[in-house]
Amino acid sequence: MIDADPTLRPEPLPEDNDRALRPQGLGEFIGQAEARANLRVFIESARRRGEAMDHTLFHGPPGLGKTTLAQIVARELGVNFRMTSGPVLAKAGDLAAILTNLEARDVLFIDEIHRLNPAVEEVLYPAMEDFELDLVIGEGPAARTVRIELQPFTLVGATTRMGLLTTPLRDRFGIPTRLQFYTIDELFEIVSRNARKLGAPADDAGAREIARRARGTPRIAGRLLRRVVDFAVVEGDGTITRELADGALTRLGVDQLGLDGADRRYLRLVAENYGGGPVGIETMSAALSESRDALEEVIEPYLLQQGLIQRTPRGRMLAQKAWTHLGIAPPKSQSDLFG
């Protein structure tokens, strides 16, 4: 099994629910400039017209702020916020219970909307389009359809797997918004602000050191910051410097690129056992005793984004940057390839 460090994975952990660190409005939200600018227009238009905002879909890698933005949309509209997730809505009745309790213009947020039960999804279509709910009462010959009028509402969906959404559902979102990985400068701002809120101010070099290793993801930056704060309080004077951040993150196994032990084992396997590749994903899966899905969804996205590996029709290959990072000279054939 790959021993992936949960601190460096963008999936939510209980410690991420620190409301004090979450931005409360669009003005406080750092990053995603294009998405924020567009949302500001859509929100203001809905407020001036006194109507529900059009249905909105946030998509992109985990940990970039989809849930936070959904909460901000409701707060800026001045309406109630209801939250659920695709796997929780097992039956049409589960969705009906939520929809019938919404007030006018409320925001309903469905996380992991790509995991909706198809039967539930069918019920959602008329609710999104016409604000009506068609429910089947009874069974067999005695079954009948009852139509329930709903208050106009805004559905905000979030997904990390846009390709798994059915076309009919995807087409019903009037405002599709892709969230991008954050730049180091944006993460630097986030880390600096949150360090002050945690009572352990960071100097510029210290905040930037954490930002550089946060894998372009605010959720990961927040986790790394908390761990560095622990070191600053116990082994320092409560201030985060570059030296303290570097020492703490190195002890936590987070290297200069933000890679953990699982990432480095993946790269070393391709380098040392397969000469840099190409090597098939099934072979990688067997060699690392890990499922193909785990490799493709947990390990590889960041390695691809950083230009450390390449996916080719023949399999995975290391890029020149990976050889440099590992401190290993590429084989002669690959050296010629890279020039």
UniProtKB/Swiss-Prot annotation:
Molecular function GO labels: ATP binding; ATP hydrolysis activity; four-way junction DNA binding; four-way junction helicase activity
Residues reported in the UniProt entry to bind Mg(2+): 67
Location (main, coarse): cytoplasm
UniProt keyword annotations, A-Z: ATP-binding, Cytoplasm, DNA damage, DNA recombination, DNA repair, DNA-binding, Hydrolase, Nucleotide-binding
Compartment(s) where it occurs, according to its Swiss-Prot or TrEMBL record: Cytoplasm
One Pfam family linked to the record: RuvB_N
Region (Disordered): 1-22
GO cellular component: cytoplasm; Holliday junction resolvase complex
Segments for region (Small ATPAse domain (RuvB-S)): 183-253
Binding annotation for DNA: 292, 311, 316
Any GO BP: DNA recombination
Subunit structure, as described in the record: Homohexamer. Forms an RuvA(8)-RuvB(12)-Holliday junction (HJ) complex. HJ DNA is sandwiched between 2 RuvA tetramers; dsDNA enters through RuvA and exits via RuvB. An RuvB hexamer assembles on each DNA strand where it exits the tetramer. Each RuvB hexamer is contacted by two RuvA subunits (via domain III) on 2 adjacent RuvB subunits; this complex drives branch migration. In the full resolvosome a probable DNA-RuvA(4)-RuvB(12)-RuvC(2) complex forms which resolves the HJ.
The protein's role, per its UniProt record: The RuvA-RuvB-RuvC complex processes Holliday junction (HJ) DNA during genetic recombination and DNA repair, while the RuvA-RuvB complex plays an important role in the rescue of blocked DNA replication forks via replication fork reversal (RFR). RuvA specifically binds to HJ cruciform DNA, conferring on it an open structure. The RuvB hexamer acts as an ATP-dependent pump, pulling dsDNA into and through the RuvAB complex. RuvB forms 2 homohexamers on either side of HJ DNA bound by 1 or 2 RuvA tetramers; 4 subunits per hexamer contact DNA at a time.
Name of the featured protein: Holliday junction branch migration complex subunit RuvB
Species annotation: Ruegeria sp. (strain TM1040) (Silicibacter sp.)
Primary gene name: ruvB
